[in-house]
């Protein structure tokens, strides 16, 4: 009874289709390639320039906290901050000022894996500056935040509201009590 329930389509074998691609025949003969090579023992012509590179010292990781973009540079002056803010405004990003009272850097207090409580999410100072066209407006907000929270880390971020991503972030102010 069960055999009569099967459709006839399952019983018919279909013929194998011809392939449009030629089968792989292995590697080509080495006769097409030049057999002799010039022995090159000159170390200065190696592409990595390994013989001429001097060792460079890396950024010392002990006692130096890494923050955001440009954190390896000395603190930015007001004119340098204004240039950075002008850059993010030219790119049509929305400036936003954020602050952090305790840790101005990524830290892992509640585990080893990244998550919400690892120092990447700061408190927003007021609202993002939608429609901002002048870096002086943003720097004025940074100064107000400094007056309100003199012991806070303050950063400026550039938010792209079209792609809904943060495009740039840099420290605008470190508290005087910070030694790192």
Swiss-Prot record:
Pfam families: RbcS, RuBisCO_small. Residues 1-54 form a transit peptide. It is a peripheral membrane protein. One of its GO terms (cellular component) is mitochondrion. Its main location: plastid. Signal peptide: none annotated. The modification Phosphoserine is found at residue 113. InterPro entries: RuBisCO_ssu, RuBisCO_ssu_dom, RuBisCO_ssu_N, RuBisCO_ssu_sf. It is found in: Plastid, Chloroplast membrane; Plastid, Chloroplast stroma. GO terms for molecular function: copper ion binding; mRNA binding; ribulose-bisphosphate carboxylase activity; salicylic acid binding. Keywords: Calvin cycle, Carbon dioxide fixation, Chloroplast, Membrane, Phosphoprotein, Photorespiration, Photosynthesis, Plastid, Transit peptide. GO terms for biological process: photorespiration; photosynthesis; reductive pentose-phosphate cycle; response to cold; ribulose bisphosphate carboxylase complex assembly. Gene3D superfamilies: Ribulose bisphosphate carboxylase, small subunit (3.30.190.10). HAMAP family: RuBisCO_S_bact (MF_00859). There are four genes coding for RBS in Arabidopsis thaliana. RuBisCO catalyzes two reactions: the carboxylation of D-ribulose 1,5-bisphosphate, the primary event in carbon dioxide fixation, as well as the oxidative fragmentation of the pentose substrate. Both reactions occur simultaneously and in competition at the same active site. Although the small subunit is not catalytic it is essential for maximal activity. Heterohexadecamer of 8 large and 8 small subunits. Belongs to the RuBisCO small chain family. This is Ribulose bisphosphate carboxylase small subunit 1A, chloroplastic. The gene is RBCS-1A.
């Amino acid at each position: 009874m069960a055999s009569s329930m099967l459709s006839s389509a399952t019983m018919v074998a279909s013929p194998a289709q011809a392939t449009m691609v030629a089968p792989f025949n292995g590697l080509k003969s080495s006769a097409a390639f030049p057999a002799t090579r010039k022995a090159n023992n000159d170390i200065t012509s190696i592409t990595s320039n390994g013989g001429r590179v001097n060792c460079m010292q890396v950024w010392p990781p002990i006692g130096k906290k890494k923050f955001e973009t440009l954190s390896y540079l000395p603190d930015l002056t007001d004119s340098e901050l204004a240039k950075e803010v002008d850059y993010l405004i030219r790119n049509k990003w929305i400036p936003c000022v954020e602050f952090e009272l305790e840790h101005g850097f990524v830290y892992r207090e509640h585990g080893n894996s990244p998550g919400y409580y690892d120092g990447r999410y700061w408190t927003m100072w007021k609202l993002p500056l939608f429609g901002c066209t002048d870096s002086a407006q943003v720097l004025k907000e940074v100064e107000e935040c400094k007056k309100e929270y003199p012991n806070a880390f303050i950063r400026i971020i550039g938010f792209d509201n079209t792609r809904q991503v943060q495009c740039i972030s840099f420290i605008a102010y470190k508290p005087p009590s910070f030694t790192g």
